[in-house]
């Protein structure tokens, strides 16, 4: 073994000895994972029919582990730009806590475990969707789109939109128009959400040479496109009620939240000064989180209520 190899091995051993369970948890991107698990749960509960509770828990755990695996693989590949950006430079790899090869092995192991477990215990359609989601996020988005096009978020947003479809497929073994609508809500929500974020973190993305929309097309174009996607998303958000797999309460809430989303996006587009624009971007970003959490929470509440009433013979 050469001196360089010995030094590398000793550095890896040091990194491993310093790493804690919390550091490995950070690799899983728990905040992102929580949203993925939540939307996956909604898809599973909203799906027609009854699923064995044990299999339902296994499905959600597999979705969570698969999401975490995607996060770990993303951090492995993006370690160079994470070291440059202020909000990511303390992640385990750039901070020197965990060696890159260990993160790669961790991510690949979790990926294989989550997909195989979901396939063997639940069904292979859900497993195939989970495998494709991991591949799409880790390879298509992280390794290709993120560094090559300002449309990275638009196309790459598909990865974050699959969880409710996976939950639905786990419960039914099918892909239906209903599950595709859930996919489209998140898919159309993603661009204005992340473009609002990028407007007040422009310097970070520029330093890392990531071609986010504000850095490539300019702030005005970004604001215009954020409004465009908000206008597209608002009516799609009401479709679960229109199509009959959500109730009137959801219809009212999704309509009001959708109109509010468009309003905040319009405020961003109409801002006529830099301070106003930055303030509007932060407000849109925060409200976008409330919007997605709100409509999926109502979907979950209605689905659980209807199934509980059905169990007692009310319906």
Curated annotation (Swiss-Prot):
The pathway noted for it is:
Porphyrin-containing compound metabolism; heme O biosynthesis; heme O from protoheme: step 1/1
Q: What is this protein called?
A: Protoheme IX farnesyltransferase
Catalysed reactions listed for this entry? heme b + (2E,6E)-farnesyl diphosphate + H2O = Fe(II)-heme o + diphosphate
Q: Which PROSITE patterns match?
A: UBIA (PS00943)
Its lineage reads:
Bacteria, Pseudomonadati, Pseudomonadota, Alphaproteobacteria, Hyphomicrobiales
- Quote one Gene Ontology molecular function term: protoheme IX farnesyltransferase activity
Family assignment? Belongs to the UbiA prenyltransferase family. Protoheme IX farnesyltransferase subfamily.
Q: Which domain of life is it from?
A: Bacteria
Which gene codes for it? ctaB
Task: Please name the source species.
Answer: Brucella canis (strain ATCC 23365 / NCTC 10854 / RM-666)
